[in-house]
Amino acid sequence: MTDTQQPELTEDGRQRRTIKSFVMRAGRMTEGQQRGLDKGWPLFGLELEDGLRDFDQVFGRSAPRTFEIGFGMGHSTLEMAAAAPEQDFIGVEVHKPGVGALLNGVMAHNLSNVRVYSCDALEVLQGCVADASLDRVLLFFPDPWHKSRHHKRRIVQPAFAELVRRKLKIGGVLHMATDWENYAEHMLEVMNAAPGYRNLAADGTYVPRPEERPVTKFERRGERLGHGVWDLKFQRQE
């Protein structure tokens, strides 16, 4: 899934300067994706400029709330939202074709529990999401930036962990997944050292793939080729 922009943050999670953890890609819009933007955005799109939001008011109810960083083409978001109509989902993605694809799917499935931002997810967390208001934060298959000189671009850093911790409710969970073992090790190192979290893995490493995380076509292909996927779950304790 597509990563987000990585601002360099201070220890308390405030933005210092911008480091990109994604590369903007030009891409054609399909008819369905364009329809999603044209017709779906006025119904389900949210703007960063609107600032702090009361999501109970946005969704018209109080329900368990999931925030997904970088939903790519939106397949997993759509599957999760359709399977859990009692929950609300806020998805953030910078690439317009993916935004259009998700919105088109939301309309096709007649879903009312999805809202979408098309901008930097960390700016949304900082400026639009109240502290202690999220039940889950999802980060599935972010850009691994596998070259050592690019590791600073990885979104999972100590300040990211602190920002997410502030936005999660006590007992809320950060769920990450990656198919790069080195990035999984990096995630584990950062999160095990992050204050205020508990690793939900029994052995303090990785959890088995949770049933609620959809399996993507890329993951299935990787499994056929013998590639691994690592899931991490960390729960806010304080």
Swiss-Prot record:
EC code(s) of this entry: 2.1.1.33
Enzyme class: transferase
Coiled coil, from the record: none
Domain of life of the source: Bacteria
Catalytic activity: guanosine(46) in tRNA + S-adenosyl-L-methionine = N(7)-methylguanosine(46) in tRNA + S-adenosyl-L-homocysteine
Binding residue positions for substrate: K147, D179, T216, K217, F218, E219
Keyword Methyltransferase found: yes
List of catalytic residues: D143
CDD domains in the cross-refs: AdoMet_MTases (cd02440)
Gene3D superfamilies registered for this protein in UniProt: Vaccinia Virus protein VP39
Entry keywords, A to Z: Methyltransferase, S-adenosyl-L-methionine, Transferase, tRNA processing
HAMAP family: tRNA_methyltr_TrmB
Family: Belongs to the class I-like SAM-binding methyltransferase superfamily. TrmB family.
The protein, known as: tRNA (guanine-N(7)-)-methyltransferase
Source organism: Ectopseudomonas mendocina (strain ymp)
